[in-house]
Amino acid sequence: VTITDNLGCVLVDYVDIINSHSEITGTLDVLEQVSCFNACDAIAQLSSSGGVLQHTYFWDNGQTYIGSGPDTAYNLCFGGHNIIIEDALGCRKTIPFIITQPDELFAQAVQVQPVQCYGFDDGIAYASATGGTTPYVFVWDDPINGSTGQDIDSLNPGIHTVYVTDANGCTSSDTVVISEPTQLEVIIVDSMTVYSYCAGTNSGQLCAFASGGTPNYNYLWNDGLNQNTSCAYNLSAQFNDYTVIVMDDRNCIASASFQ
């Protein structure tokens, strides 16, 4: 400090400012990060030293604490956070920290194989998952007693659901539709009324018309000639019971008879 009087005399003196209190410091540990996407279940713990006790902690979730710790905060959400430590003299220290979270868990189910023939139960589906925390557990149709694993077979047609649970207990689900063809059917028509009614002639003609199932169709007649076209020719009235067997592209079978 400098003092000057009216005559211009000057006196200079010094004073030492001593900070008798150490700096406020805080030690923060994130004990648990957010377990599932958009959950608020993280846990953090703070302890402090320095300054003048007691300390007051102001958490940004509204929680307060008086002491020097450790103090634990629960139900913290994803994102950046700040804690203010205030000592007995009103001096403050801000401690920033970040809470992380896993990516959102998504389940996906796809049809690998539809039901091959009408009324069968041989569909196959496959499930996968992204996000969350590995490893995953896959359960089909019944989340408690269902079949487990990413692949599932012997499915009947209709909607099937896969439930996925990750290592943190987060869950997701997806559905898949197992399709089936319509029923394979075949009818026999006396083509153009040229069926032979005269004994001893072989001028009859029958045609089979298949529908449903999965085209293309293969035909086999038990006409004595084993013809394998949709129409059978040169048929005799004496052989009065004709049957055609139709097989579609998935080896489904239907038959019809003509007398």
Question: Which residues does each PLM region occupy?
Answer:
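Proline-enriched interdomain boundary motifs that mark the N-terminal boundary
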Residues: 22-30, 104-111, 183-191
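Short glycine/proline-centered coil/turn motifs in the loop regions
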Residues: 49-53, 130-134, 211-215
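Solvent-exposed segments in extracellular or luminal domains encompassing
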Residues: 70-80, 150-160, 230-242
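Conserved structural position at the C-terminal beta-strand
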Residues: 3-5, 85-87, 164-166, 246-248
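Edge beta-strands of extracellular beta-sandwich domains
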Residues: 10-17, 92-100, 171-179, 253-259
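Short beta-strand segments within Ig-like beta-sandwich modules, predominantly Fibronectin type-III
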Residues: 62-69, 142-148, 222-228
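Coil residues (strongly favoring Ser/Thr
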Residues: 6, 14, 30, 42-44, ...
